[in-house]
Design a protein with these regions (language model features):
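A short helix->beta-strand "capping" segment at the edge of beta-propeller domains
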Residues: 12-27
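Immunoglobulin-like IPT/TIG beta-sandwich domains and homologous Ig-like subdomains
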Residues: 23-32, 39, 43-45, 51-64, ...
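Beta-propeller and closely related beta-sheet repeat lectin domains
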Residues: 31-34, 82-87, 138-142, 184-187, ...
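Residue-level detector of Asp-centered blade-edge/turn motifs that repeat once per structural unit
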Residues: 36-39, 88-91, 144-147, 189-192, ...
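Conserved beta-propeller blade signature
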Residues: 42-44, 95, 150-152, 195-197, ...
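A detector of repeated loop/turn-to-beta-strand junctions in beta-rich toroidal repeat architectures
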Residues: 50, 66, 83, 109-112, ...
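Beta-propeller blade signature
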Residues: 53-60, 111-121, 159-165, 205-214, ...
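Blade-level signature of beta-propeller repeat domains, shared across WD40, Kelch, NHL, RCC1
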Residues: 341-376
Length: 489
């Protein structure tokens, strides 16, 4: 009770400081995770039923503090997962796979192998099958690859599989070289298209996966141990057979690729008893130190980020959610607690650069300090000078996908934001997020490479002179002028 009172006071101070804004329209039910859709809306999952999903959209001025909620459908019967793999596809659809828990399960863990795909245009869910031979998926790591394929790891094995977004068919990938099973590991997409992970079972080893070769290889030791020992000394049942018993290897914290090419990796509790401060480590993915790990600072206050969240702020700093509820910020040199702010729930990075934190009745927007380096922004090269409501257009440029996936949560419920949004603002200050889709890449830090996406102009948009921006990871391009015409072309 004392901790709850302390947290309540901290939230009150945060609201008073101006760093945090409380939503005027709170969620109709408690939500447990959030994903940014390509039309600027936020998809959330009901904490109560776990089958029902909602979308939250900003108001006419683009203000996320004064938006509206609407229910947008339910998963298929028998599938109400908690802690699953997830991501947006390049065409704008949303995919989920597995689930550590599922409503109505017979065992302590369910590790279900079900899945589903959400179509944001039709607002419908379609059941998704599992890779051949995968009896269990659970809370598995996943990532969208630069070529648009969805890569999923099997929690209980070294297995990996690709989902073809066009056919929604799975193909078993090579897992050659994988040092341990995928359980509790998080995957971080690097600029060269490879995936970095810090092992949990085989800690402090780290590994790199190359989709081009289908091989894993060691990325060396993380120097400090980032994983915590499991509190469950006995295995946990997830199926009817005697062998269907899971021995957890422990937990680890989230990892974020920063604009300078370093990956800030956070740890869970340290020490054999799991009661020490979490460690951190920095991986250099480019430059003269490429492929090297160095130890970072320990968490202040004896805290840690085991199975928690991290967000890349537009400033390039990493916001980390401590297990205590405190927020910490890594700026590349120092790791300090954030004053006048508190972690109230799962986060999502918004196109405004704000960070929404979900809570049952106190969902807030965190306003991070600082601003991005101008060189990190998307740059528009070619675009339609005139657009018509209801029509689709192509826009090209550079760095449309940002410099990082920008979001991380341990080993499951991935919600990266490395895809372009197109925002149109008219002379009256009304903001319209178009729906983008069919991005040419889902990579990160694409540099001077020419990339593109398509955007659907809303049918409700007002005619007249307007500005258009491309936004990635909360960082907007320089605006360009367009004309919204009512004439059909």
């Amino acid at each position: 009770m004392q901790m709850q009172t302390s947290n309540a006071r901290a939230r009150a101070r945060a609201l008073a400081s101006g760093r945090v804004t409380r939503l005027l329209s709170q969620p109709p039910v408690a939500m447990q995770m959030a994903w940014l859709m390509t039309d600027g809306s936020i998809l959330t999952q009901s904490q109560l039923t776990r089958q029902n999903f909602y979308r939250y959209s900003p108001d006419a001025k683009g203000d996320y503090a004064a938006g509206k909620w609407r229910e947008v459908g339910s998963l298929q019967a028998g599938y109400a997962p908690l802690a699953f793999a997830s991501s947006l596809l390049a065409d704008g659809r949303f995919v989920i796979s597995g689930g550590e828990y599922n409503s109505g399960g017979k065992y302590t863990l369910q590790l279900v192998n079900l899945g589903a795909v959400y179509d944001p245009v039709k607002m419908t869910w379609t059941a998704l099958g599992h890779p051949h031979g995968w009896g269990w998926i659970g809370d598995s790591p996943s990532s969208i690859l630069p070529d648009g394929r969805y890569l999923l790891g099997d929690k209980l094995h070294e297995w990996d599989a690709y989902l073809d977004p066009k056919t929604l068919q799975w193909t078993r990938a090579s897992d050659a070289g994988k040092a341990d099973f995928n359980a509790e590991e998080g995957w971080t997409l690097l600029a060269d298209g490879t995936i970095l992970t810090a092992d949990v079972k085989n800690a402090p080893n780290s590994e790199i996966y190359d989709p081009a070769t289908g091989h894993w290889k060691s990325a060396g030791t993380t120097v400090v141990d980032l994983h915590s020992p499991t509190p469950d000394r006995d295995c946990v049942k997830y199926g009817p057979k005697p062998k269907d018993c899971y021995s957890a290897p422990g937990e680890i914290g989230p990892a974020i690729l920063r604009p300078d090419g370093t990956v800030f990796y956070t740890g869970s509790f340290s020490g054999p008893q799991g009661n020490g401060a979490g460690h951190t480590a920095i991986y250099y993915s480019k430059g003269r130190k490429a492929g090297k790990w160095v130890a970072g600072p320990d968490f202040p206050n004896g805290d840690n980020a085991g199975d928690s969240f991290a967000v890349l702020e537009p400033s390039g700093n990493v916001l980390v959610f401590g297990g205590s509820g405190a927020l910490y910020e890594w700026n590349g040199k120092t790791f300090t607690q954030v004053r006048n702010a508190w972690a109230v729930g799962p986060p999502i990075l918004l196109p405004t650069g704000q960070i929404m934190m979900l809570a049952a009745s106190s969902t807030v927007l965190y306003n991070p300090p600082g601003s991005p380096n101008a060189s990190w922004a998307p740059a528009i090269k070619s675009y339609p000078k005139s657009v018509v409501p209801g029509k689709t257009y192509k826009i090209t440029g550079t760095q449309f996908n940002g410099l990082s996936q920008a979001m991380a949560y341990g080993d499951e419920e991935q919600n990266p934001t490395n895809y372009p949004l197109v925002r149109i603002t008219n002379a009256a200050g009304n903001v319209y997020y178009t729906r983008t889709h069919d991005h040419s890449t889902m990579g990160v830090a694409t540099g001077s490479k020419l990339v593109w996406t398509y955007f659907d102009v809303p049918k409700t948009i007002s005619s007249g002179v307007a500005t258009l921006e491309v936004v990635a990871n909360g960082i907007a391009s320089k605006p360009v002028k367009i004309v919204v015409s009512t004439a059909r072309r």
